[in-house]
């Protein structure tokens, strides 16, 4: 019974990734229609990546459930070790293409936290109904003590390094903390912004329109390391401003799709891809499934 419940929830994480890549059109991003601003990956690359990651999603939630009483740092270390194996498997499946590295990191923590939360709230195991927004908040808050050390440990000693990863370079150049920052703050972009916005949208619109509007909203607020890496601070600010204007227009679903298709070409021409917003879109979908908003 327990394993079946944990399996069903881990499948919601996979479903969230499938919904994210399938949502179309997404400016600058891989979707059903085209590869956005990416010349090294496609919709199929993402499918290959998700299949590779899926068994690890189950391992994350089972680890959180099994070690719920463990010190947060010890649980983090278990999840990170699993996450590194998942990353290696992903790169093998995609021939070295980074499709979900940051998202895998975040999912490892959130699925681990979900497992730990379920171990502490057994009624959710016996009656898998709708998770409340309070449940969502509690799960995200469990990540904070697991990752309180992360910025200092991972990014605090970069002055001694000569070669940087993509994420380290963003921190050194711009102070962008990326997924580590989101995690160490308890995913406040999710709990304070993305999910409240999506709950409102889904109460007023059909699911696809709500998802597209959520993407635009995220592009208007997220500190997007992918955009900054590709185009610099000014390009990122420009995208945010454009998306704020698009939100203000309150377009019909048809006109919104047309506007996003047009903006997709703009971002392709500039080689810009809002990958940070895409990751948070998928994480929002995961909790939307738990709360039965979708």
Swiss-Prot record:
Coiled-coil positions: none
GO MF annotations in UniProt: ATP binding; triphosphoribosyl-dephospho-CoA synthase activity
One Pfam family matching this protein: CitG
Enzyme Commission number: 2.4.2.52
Keywords, in A-Z order: ATP-binding, Nucleotide-binding, Transferase
The keyword Iron-sulfur is assigned to this record: no
Biological process terms in GO annotation: prosthetic group biosynthetic process
Catalysed reaction, written as an equation: 3'-dephospho-CoA + ATP = 2'-(5''-triphospho-alpha-D-ribosyl)-3'-dephospho-CoA + adenine
Keyword Ligase applies: no
EC main group: transferase
Highest rank taxon of the organism: Bacteria
HAMAP family assigned to the protein according to its UniProt record, in alphabetical order: CitG
Alphabetical list of NCBIfam families matching this protein: citrate_citG
Family from the record: Belongs to the CitG/MdcB family.
Protein name per its UniProtKB record: Probable 2-(5''-triphosphoribosyl)-3'-dephosphocoenzyme-A synthase
Source organism of this protein record: Streptococcus pyogenes serotype M1
């Amino acid at each position: 019974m327990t394993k079946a419940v944990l399996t069903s929830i881990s499948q919601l994480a996979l479903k969230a990734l499938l919904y994210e890549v399938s949502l179309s059109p997404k400016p600058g991003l891989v979707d059903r229609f085209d590869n956005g601003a990416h010349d090294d990956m496609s919709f199929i690359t993402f499918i290959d990546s998700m299949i590779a990651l899926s068994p690890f999603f189950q391992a994350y939630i089972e680890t959180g459930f099994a070690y719920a009483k463990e010190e947060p740092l010890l649980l983090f270390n278990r999840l990170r070790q699993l996450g590194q194996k998942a990353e290696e498997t992903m790169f093998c499946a995609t021939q070295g293409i980074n499709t979900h590295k940051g998202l895998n990191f975040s999912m490892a923590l959130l699925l681990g936290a979900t497992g730990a939360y379920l171990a502490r709230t057994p009624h959710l195991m016996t009656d898998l109904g709708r998770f409340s927004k309070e449940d969502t908040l509690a799960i995200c808050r469990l990540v904070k003590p697991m990752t309180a050390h992360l910025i200092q440990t991972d990014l605090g000693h970069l002055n001694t390094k000569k070669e940087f990863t993509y994420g380290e370079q963003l921190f050194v150049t711009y102070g962008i903390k990326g997924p580590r920052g989101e995690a160490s703050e308890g995913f406040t972009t999710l709990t304070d912004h993305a999910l409240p916005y999506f709950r409102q949208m889904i109460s007023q619109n059909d699911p696809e329109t709500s998802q597209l509007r959520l993407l635009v909203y995220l592009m208007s607020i997220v500190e997007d390391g992918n955009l900054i890496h590709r185009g610099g601070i000014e390009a990122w600010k420009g995208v945010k401003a454009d998306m704020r204007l698009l939100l203000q227009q309150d377009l019909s679903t048809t006109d919104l799709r047309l506007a996003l298709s047009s903006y997709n070409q703009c971002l392709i021409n500039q080689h810009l891809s809002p990958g940070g917003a895409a990751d948070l879109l998928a994480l929002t979908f995961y909790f939307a499934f738990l709360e039965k908003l979708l």
